[in-house]
Amino acid sequence: MDRIIEKLDHGWWVVSHEQKLWLPKGELPYGEAANFDLVGQRALQIGEWQGEPVWLIQQQRRYDMGSVRQVIDLDVGLFQLAGRGVQLAEFYRSHKYCGYCGHEMYPSKTEWAMLCSHCRERYYPQIAPCIIVAIRRDDSILLAQHTRHRNGVHTVLAGFVEVGETLEQAVAREVMEESGIKVKHLRYVTSQPWPFPQSLMTAFMAEYDSGDIVIDPKELLEANWYRYDDLPLLPPPGTVARRLIEDTVAMCRAEYE
């Protein structure tokens, strides 16, 4: 699936190492390989964006290595491809040896997988399913400031799905653990790959059922009900959290205006 990059190869370049992304001038590189000193590197095409190939190169650059969060304002499709590249690079880096027998592994030529040369075990990139849910109570939405977001951003509740748990059960558990309330009328909305580090966000909307807000201080700094026309600082556009909030606001406007 991979090949050596030549001088006239062009497209978008995802150069990644240890979950970092090469961002010269703070941007995802685009153009001919020769312009970025990438000729001769081994690359894997991981998709296309607006008719141009998107290449993954597993390489550590001395300067300008940053987080994929820095390109979150890109078009959603290109951001997802950048996230795919970072996740694949880390997968290949962390699966050089078989977890069963310890022998060296090699990449599959037909799919994104690593194969053991000894016991023939096959490994795929790990994906961690998560839930994220917007909770509405009359004309208000529950928004929280997470301990990991100390920049004033308020967002909806989210968490990882546990082993042996349905998505619906995960929503009920996470909401109760983080905020102390119960929800009802759960409705699936959409999903979004989220490379922090390898999540798949499954988005829901729900209605408040019962209980008072009691936050988990290990997870949240605060949580409150906010009227739809008086909201705090929100996640950036393009995130599934922002979509859930905007969808909830639209529902409130339709009912209360």
UniProtKB/Swiss-Prot annotation:
Q: Which residues bind a divalent metal cation 1?
A: 158, 178, 219
Residues at which a divalent metal cation 2 binds:
174
Chain ranges of the Nudix hydrolase domain: 125-248
Q: Which residues bind a divalent metal cation 3?
A: 174, 178, 219
Its UniProt entry gives the catalysed reaction(s) as: a 5'-end NAD(+)-phospho-ribonucleoside in mRNA + H2O = a 5'-end phospho-adenosine-phospho-ribonucleoside in mRNA + beta-nicotinamide D-ribonucleotide + 2 H(+); NAD(+) + H2O = beta-nicotinamide D-ribonucleotide + AMP + 2 H(+); NADH + H2O = reduced beta-nicotinamide D-ribonucleotide + AMP + 2 H(+)
Q: Which GO terms describe its molecular function?
A: magnesium ion binding; manganese ion binding; NAD+ diphosphatase activity; NADH pyrophosphatase activity; RNA NAD-cap (NMN-forming) hydrolase activity; zinc ion binding
Q: What is its EC number?
A: 3.6.1.-, 3.6.1.22
Q: Which UniProt keywords apply?
A: Hydrolase, Magnesium, Manganese, Metal-binding, NAD, Zinc
Cofactor dependence:
Mg(2+); Mn(2+); Zn(2+)
State a single Pfam family of this protein: NUDIX
Annotated residues for binding of substrate: 25, 69, 111, 124, 192-199, 241
Cofactor binding remark = Divalent metal cations. Mg(2+) or Mn(2+). Binds 1 zinc ion per subunit.
Domain of life of the organism encoding this protein: Bacteria
Record-level GO cellular component terms: cytosol
Q: Where is this motif: Nudix box?
A: 159-180
Give the residues the record marks as binding Zn(2+).
98, 101, 116, 119
Q: Which GO terms describe its biological process?
A: NAD catabolic process; NADH metabolic process; NADP catabolic process
Gene3D superfamilies in the record:
3.90.79.20, Nucleoside Triphosphate Pyrophosphohydrolase
What is known about what this protein does? mRNA decapping enzyme that specifically removes the nicotinamide adenine dinucleotide (NAD) cap from a subset of mRNAs by hydrolyzing the diphosphate linkage to produce nicotinamide mononucleotide (NMN) and 5' monophosphate mRNA. The NAD-cap is present at the 5'-end of some mRNAs and stabilizes RNA against 5'-processing. Has preference for mRNAs with a 5'-end purine. Catalyzes the hydrolysis of a broad range of dinucleotide pyrophosphates.
Q: How does it assemble?
A: Homodimer.
Q: Which family does it belong to?
A: Belongs to the Nudix hydrolase family. NudC subfamily.
Recorded protein name is NAD-capped RNA hydrolase NudC
What species is given as this protein's source?
A: Escherichia coli O157:H7
